[in-house]
Amino acid sequence: MAARRARDIPPLTADLVLSGGGVRFVGLVGAVVALMDAGYSVQRISGVSGGSVVGTILAAASQGDQLTAAQVKELALSVPLRSWRDAVPLPLVGPVWGFLRDTALYRGDAAHRWIRGELANLGVHTWGDLAYPADDLMPERRYRAVVTVTDVTTGQLVRLPWDYRRVYGLDPDEQSVADAVRASMAVPFFYRPVTLTSAAGLRSTLVDGGVLSNFPIYTFDRLDGRPPKWPTFGVTVVPEISDGVGAMVPVLRPLRLFGQALLLENLISTMLVGHDQTYLNQPWVSVRAIKVNSTDVSVLDFGISRDRLERLYDNGYAAASEFLSTWDWAAYLQRFRAAHYPDPPVGPN
């Protein structure tokens, strides 16, 4: 694959990192559409959980400009979220039986089928279909999308397709994109975990990437000591840790009625965003993060109405528009990068 020449790169270019957040992913879509409407060309997208759904579909659609901004919005608003709560078909006790049998309330098969179908409609089945032509990237990173997953068997964060060969001995080009997304959104105790068998026959249990890092905005940051050629914008729909679990999962707000529940609230909050909080507090990181107001939507509210989804979409669009109104790439480089990178930018982030 030949590296992209400078004249082939649009003047407004960015990589994106999309946080997890369950059904709040619609807010991510609103932010991405605002970037599209502003003229940005997105080169690569990293996603966690709900962000992995958005990221892979947008990466697939970007090949040949298959979806307009209006079509992206309508696709997000028409996701059959209610069907994604696919419990074992037993009246009344279905979710309970699923939890006892599989340590999860729901199977996740409906979500998997929908994701696989939408990707197929865009011509994407395996990661080889999302190859990215950039010779100045490490071979394992030459893909338009990457999803973050937690491997609880080996106790590590894995980024697929980047880590298929290193961790599992598998050819990334032959692995299913939909399978990786399904693993990234396997919220513990809500969706069944995903099992991946390595080339050596070892079985790993994969769950939601947000368990270890829900907003890895550093994913595309360069490791070779050279400056970035274009920015990486992060979009998050999860409140800061100071907002507590009530802002993240409103259905759990009654926990505050019990003094002894404070520790549980703090534990849940820390699991969702604590790993990333210190890094995100750094000024050179927070300045490139788009924060979408989503506190009135539970991350697991799969019965949410279309009206509320549209408001969440609008919040995302507004957040990105406000961000772009003050964003200055040259000023960012001068303030945070100039002292460290004396050479001109070369190659992707």
Mark where each language-model region is:
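Active-site periphery "cap/insert" segments of enzyme catalytic domains
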Residues: 109-147, 158
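Glycine-rich anion-binding loop/nest that anchors nucleotide
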Residues: 209-216, 230-239
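Residues at the starts of beta-strands that form the adenosine-phosphate
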Residues: 41-44, 144, 229-232
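Patatin-like phospholipase
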Residues: 9-17, 22-120, 157, 162-170, ...
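C-terminal helical/tail subdomains of lipid-metabolizing enzymes
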Residues: 237-239, 259-349
